[in-house]
From Swiss-Prot:
This is Anaerobic nitric oxide reductase transcription regulator NorR. Residues 481-500 bind DNA. The keyword Cell division does not apply. It comes from the Bacteria. Coiled coil: none annotated. Required for the expression of anaerobic nitric oxide (NO) reductase, acts as a transcriptional activator for at least the norVW operon. Activation also requires sigma-54. HAMAP family: NorR. Residues 187-416 form the Sigma-54 factor interaction domain. The keyword Transcription applies.
Length: 506
């Protein structure tokens, strides 16, 4: 069997029929798998020494969420280094990145693999991978024929990346005009809700508007801020982060605006605040709903006039800063309750964005699970970490009250449990490795404390009880530290310090 002119023409026609890049990529991959009669095919984008799946056929859905680093996948590294078709023998010692990821063949290893590097000029931009369980599957196809397929795929991918670059305004007036793929922002998801959010980010990123990012705790609001910054003309300048919930009232003004030597006890030198650090760049204010009304008034002045005053200084400093703010509160309700200034709310919410909760993102759960599985594989030095079909169904059926952050922790915990019960460096996550419950945990009681393992002394007993109290408060408040601090009737900064001392956070 070989490629006829009709077959190549058919592939080219399928590329033109697609509506949007994603549809074209999927048509290409599906057609190739049919023509080559192989078990799996994938189109990957190359960026920063890793391959990012764009379209797959015949592979588990979570592959779309994985990020394949060259260091962790020797076959993909060989493809990246090659300038031509790469054929891996059936007895190759190099592990295949898709072992265990072909549905119905999870227990078997891939026997035939072909890699086609894709170039735009001299720049590697991606790869096509073709896999089969039959060792001789690709021997009937000549390298010349596979090169033609690679050329068609490279053209489609190059055009898509160039259009994406232009749409996101990375090709700015005065730039070199050289093709540079946009940096990965780790915003993984193909659900309608995430697709809409990405479109809105593209719209607002190129402007200089302030943006208010809303959403539940753990949904990934910081990633949205990073994506906005990376897609803006300010991307070459700093993105400065400040968690307003972790700021004690006594130092909040200094953190935002800086101070001069002698402004207060302990001010032994001049210090720049976050606004100065973010000059000509972007300042991301997380948990902005936790700021006091007094600080809200000072923040409003900066947004109105573009100048700041360091604590203890009468002089004003001009700053050029774009502000991105995030909150898990309903700020409209906070305004009505008198806890948030209406004028500041309107200044910040010129272009509001909402990050959807994970329960509204459908199959994105599986893609994100694949991403975290690959992270765990690299971190623990495992050859593979895969989800069983039962585990995938289990993850899809759960409501994820803690959103993406809860999913990340669940995957990491499941990998550790599965690794402990299985010899070797291959881990398959089963349903029983996930202890998921949407029930609200009860507050710790004296009985639960007495049921803890016996401790050696009073200090250890006290620390164990504090640890349990903090865990329960975080669980009841969706891992929101500010809300947990209020529930425990303590200052959020003190709670962070105590949790760090007790080993509950890095």
């Amino acid at each position: 069997m070989s490629f006829s002119v009709e077959v190549l023409a058919g592939i080219a026609i399928e590329l033109q029929r697609g509506i949007g890049h994603q549809d074209r990529f999927q048509r290409l991959i599906t057609t190739l798998r049919q023509v080559l009669a192989c078990d799996a095919s994938a189109l990957l984008r190359y960026e920063s020494r890793q391959f990012i799946p764009l379209a797959i056929d015949g592979l588990a859905q979570d592959v779309l969420g994985r990020r394949f680093t060259l260091e962790g996948h020797p076959r993909l590294e060989a493809i990246a280094r090659a300038g031509d078709v790469v054929r891996f023998p059936a007895d190759s010692d190099l592990p295949d990145p898709y072992d265990g990821l072909i549905p119905g063949q999870e227990s078997l290893k891939v026997h035939a693999c072909v890699g086609l590097p894709l170039f735009a000029g001299q720049n590697l931009i991606g790869a096509l991978t073709l896999d089969a369980m039959t060792p001789e599957q690709f021997e009937v196809f000549r390298d010349e024929e596979l090169r033609l397929v690679a050329a068609l795929a490279a053209g489609a991918l190059s055009n898509a990346l160039l259009i994406e670059q232009l749409e996101s305004q990375n090709m700015l007036p005065g730039s070199s005009g050289v093709f540079e793929p946009i940096k990965e922002t780790h915003m993984i998801g193909l659900s309608p809700a995430m697709t809409q959010l990405k479109k809105e980010i593209e719209i607002v990123a190129g402007s200089d508007l302030n943006v208010l990012i809303g959403g539940e705790t753990g949904t990934g609001k910081e990633l949205v801020a990073k994506a906005i910054h990376q897609g803006s003309p300010r991307a070459v300048n700093p993105l400065v982060y400040l968690n307003c919930a972790a700021l004690p009232e006594s130092v909040a003004e200094s953190e935002l605006f800086g101070h001069v030597k002698g402004a207060f006890t302990g001010a032994i030198s001049n210090r720049s605040g976050k606004f100065e650090m973010a000059d000509n760049g972007t300042l991301f204010l997380d948990e902005i709903g936790e700021l006091s009304l007094a600080l809200q008034a000072k923040l409003l002045r900066v947004l109105q006039y573009g100048d700041i005053q360091r604590v203890g200084d009468d002089r004003s400093l001009r700053v050029d800063v774009r502000v991105l703010a995030a909150t898990n509160r309903d700020l409209r309700e906070e305004v009505l309750a008198g806890r948030f200034r209406a004028d500041l709310f309107h200044r910040l919410s010129v272009f509001p964005l909402f990050v959807p909760p994970l329960r509204e993102r459908g199959d994105d759960v599986v893609l994100l699970a694949g991403y975290f599985c690959e992270q765990c594989r690299l971190r623990l030095g495992l050859s593979r970490v895969v989800l069983s079909p039962g585990a995938r169904r289990h993850l899809l059926n759960y409501g994820w009250p803690g959103n993406v952050r809860e999913l990340e922790h669940a995957i990491h915990r499941a990998v550790v449990l599965a690794r402990a019960t299985r010899a070797g460096d291959e881990v398959v996550l089963e349903e029983q490795h996930f202890a998921l419950s949407e029930d609200v945990l009860p507050a710790p009681s004296a009985e639960s404390f007495l049921a803890l393992p016996a401790c050696r002394n009073l200090r250890e007993s006290t620390e164990n009880f504090q640890r349990e109290m903090i865990r329960q408060a975080l669980a009841q408040n969706n891992h929101n530290w500010a809300a947990s601090a209020r529930a425990l009737e303590t200052d959020v900064a003190n709670l962070h310090r105590l949790a760090k001392r007790l080993g509950l956070k890095d």
